[in-house]
Amino acid sequence: MTRAGEVLPGFAGGTINLASAGLGARALFATDEFFGPLERMLKDEPAAFHPGLYDDHGKWMDGWETRRRRGAGHDYAVIALAAKGRIAGFDVDTSHFTGNYPSACSIEACHSAEDPDEATEWVQLLPVTGLGPNAHHFFAAHSDAVYSHIRLRIHPDGGIARLRVYGTPALDLKAMANETIDLASCLLGGRIVAFSNGHYGHERLIAPGRGANMGDGWETRRRREPGYDWIIVKLAARGHVERILVDTAHFKGNYPDACSLQAADLGGMTAECDMLVASSAMFWNELLPHRKLSADSVHEYGSDMLRHADPVTHVRLNIYPDGGVSRLRIYGRVADPRSR
């Protein structure tokens, strides 16, 4: 059990939240949602508490909350993950639930092309485990299998503020061998490994869709010294870059003056080597030369503007001198494993 604001456990390193509504996770079914709908449990922002806020059902709580049971049994909910993936662990968060949290929970998972039904076979990833009030509860999952859906059981009833499912998307390289894909997409396995500054956030730079507002992207603090800011993305797969998109949506008085990109083929470097990646990036080959940017616009750069045709595994986006970028897309094809 860990209080809000504490450091994430080791198993969460190099993962994304597969249960993020912002990435596309969906609430499919709940046995009861009297005090709070299941969708709230999948929200990306930390749970909030409003002491004086009530609705027609009683005290408004920022999470999924069921009514008090007066008989045998327990409540459960089914969630479609944002992407099929390998699950590293969970955060069952009872923030602000002090007298109405479940006594325990358990979690199961399945792999299904369709939404689960009564015939679906589930695998238990977390046995019945006790919960406490107003706290993050981190549990590691010990499985290398790929799953698409989660079933959270709460015993016997109560409220869960947030459920985080930390994992890595499972990319079917063979199925995508001849397709142009966004190699940087976090839903395919792309991930941010390092950045110079992320004062106003960075995680959503490689998220799906266009940014909803100025807080939905990567933005640095105002630079008061010489230099520029940068961010490094490990691609979902080693690939040939064909087209780049830099989107400054909603950044109007704080967009970068210009950008450039560098790239490298670093082979199969794992998350444990991320610190080494950052120190070597200044020497990487130029992929996109210095280009001017404009406010609240989509900037596309085709193959005729790119200077590096070899396969790459990592890219570094440089912004001059600072500012915000909503989305970065690196479109290309997965490289043949035999190519150099």
UniProtKB/Swiss-Prot annotation:
Keywords tagged on the record: Hydrolase, Plasmid, Purine metabolism
MF terms (GO), sorted A to Z: allantoicase activity
Pathway: Nitrogen metabolism; (S)-allantoin degradation; (S)-ureidoglycolate from allantoate (aminidohydrolase route): step 1/1
E.C. code: 3.5.3.4
Reactions catalysed: allantoate + H2O = (S)-ureidoglycolate + urea
GO biological process: allantoin catabolic process; purine nucleobase metabolic process
Gene3D superfamilies tied to this protein: Galactose-binding domain-like (2.60.120.260)
InterPro entries cross-referenced by the UniProt entry: Allantoicase, Allantoicase_dom, Galactose-bd-like_sf
Class of enzymatic activity (EC top level): hydrolase
Any one Pfam family match given in the protein's UniProt record, by short name: Allantoicase
Family: Belongs to the allantoicase family.
Name the record gives this protein: Probable allantoicase
Source organism of the structure: Rhizobium meliloti (strain 1021) (Ensifer meliloti)
Gene designation per UniProt: alc
